[in-house]
Design a protein with these regions (language model features):
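Secretory targeting and sorting signals
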Residues: 1-28, 96
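Hinge/cleft segment of the Venus flytrap/periplasmic-binding protein
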Residues: 24, 31-75, 322-379
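Flexible loop/hinge segments that line or gate small-molecule binding clefts
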Residues: 35-41, 141, 147-185, 203, ...
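Short beta-strand elements in bilobed, periplasmic/extracellular small-molecule ligand-binding domains
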Residues: 101-112, 175, 203-206, 226-246, ...
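Hydrophobic alpha-helical
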Residues: 136-153, 222, 241-308
Length: 379
């Protein structure tokens, strides 16, 4: 990955005084904040500004593990990918491969090609390898429940990446640990960026995929945090399933622009890809790439999102996953499992990438993670 910097973010405690309300029409929910709250939400604005400043920091020290077992030799890891066309899944796979070379292990990748049958077949191929450990790369283990049970019966530890909504160990499904950022923190900092950048005065469109519980929860949390600021108005909640984003987003954005006009000043989306598809419609409407609506993706932060941000092309910010770093963490967690130790418990802090702090990079990872894991493994 091209960037190895990081930022820590303060966890902001807040009270939501009122919720957004509205009516549903087709795929969109029109909504606005209600209730008597202090104009401009000065207290919430101050919290948001502090959180965003911390999340945009690129020089914070490594906050991950510094102690653990030496490298356990002679292991083979199978990486079962939901689909290698997903930039997040493939980015983590590259991190696993890189870390495995350092620790002295072999890695095989099995591509599920994005279908339930493909995932089950890939998992079955991984089991046939009789690996030391298996990575659940970006899918719910329930999609391959039979294979996961066989792995457990064979004593093969499973580690997930985005396999469950929460980070850490899981008993149902049975995972040694699950590597992901906390959805609550990603959602809150995305909303805080809008509140802080707009100084508490924004008209927001929120893009989600309500068919995915994890995505819906993320957008619900973003909506809840935005509602804490009386002068931030949720203009529309757009429910566009991710598989349909490439065919529906342009028409939806064109309709939004016609209906909302200059009231629409900010957007948030549960995945950066919505802004890739929104760009042509915004361009056709005469919007400048670095102008309103200012868009933030609460998604993986894939290279195409970084390209849009660096080029100031209809996306101003993203909350990226540290993909390579998470690949290294997965290898470290396996090493702990093989050594009979518990999971590290580490969860990467959220970070906000903008054109001002990206340095032209196409990814984000914490500063010093490679050195930290090498030291732990004595490699």
């Amino acid at each position: 990955m091209l960037s190895t910097r990081k930022a820590t973010v303060a966890v902001v405690t807040f009270l939501v005084a009122a919720a957004a309300a509205g009516c549903t029409s087709g795929s969109a929910t029109e909504a606005s904040t209600v209730g008597a709250r202090e104009p401009g939400c000065p207290a919430v604005l101050a919290e948001a500004q502090q959180a965003v400043k911390a999340a945009e920091d690129i020089n914070a020290p490594w906050s991950g593990p510094t102690r653990g077992p030496d490298a356990v030799p002679g292991k083979t890891i199978a990486y079962v990918a939901q689909t290698m066309t997903n930039p997040g899944v493939s980015g983590v796979a590259k991190g696993v491969q890189e870390a495995a070379e350092v620790i002295g292990w072999d890695v095989r990748t099995f591509d599920g090609e994005g279908t339930p049958a493909g995932i089950r077949n890939a998992f079955a191929e991984a089991l046939a390898l009789k690996p030391s450990g298996i990575v659940i790369g970006g899918f719910d283990p329930a999609a391959a429940a039979g294979q996961a049970e066989r792995a457990g019966a064979a004593g093969i530890p499973l580690i997930g990446w985005h396999a469950t909504p929460a980070p850490g160990p899981s008993t149902d499904p049975e995972l040694f640990t699950n590597v992901t950022t906390r959805v609550e923190e990603v959602a809150e900092i995305s909303a805080d960026w809008i509140i802080a950048r707009s100084e508490g005065h924004a008209g927001v469109v929120l893009f989600t995929d309500a068919s995915i519980p994890f995505a819906k929860r993320k957008s619900d949390l973003i909506r809840k945090r935005l509602a804490a600021c009386s002068d931030v108005e949720l203009l529309s909640l757009q429910d566009i399933p991710i598989p349909e984003a490439n065919t529906r987003t342009v028409d939806e954005v064109t309709s939004l622009q016609s209906r909302l006009g200059d009231r629409w000043t900010y957007s948030a989306a549960i995945n950066d890809l919505y802004f890739d598809h929104a760009a042509p419609a915004l361009r056709a409407a005469g919007h400048k790439g670095d102008g309103a609506p200012f868009n933030i993706g609460a998604g993986d932060g894939d290279p195409s999102a970084f390209e849009r941000i660096n080029g100031k092309r209809y996306q101003a910010a993203t909350v990226p996953e540290p993909l390579s770093e998470q690949g290294w963490q997965i290898v470290d967690e396996f090493n702990r499992a093989f050594a009979g130790e518990p999971a590290s418990g580490y969860v990467a802090p959220v970070h906000i990438t903008t054109a001002d702090n990206s340095g032209g990079a196409l990814s984000w990872d914490s500063e010093g993670y490679r050195q930290a894991y090498r030291k732990i493994w004595d490699r």
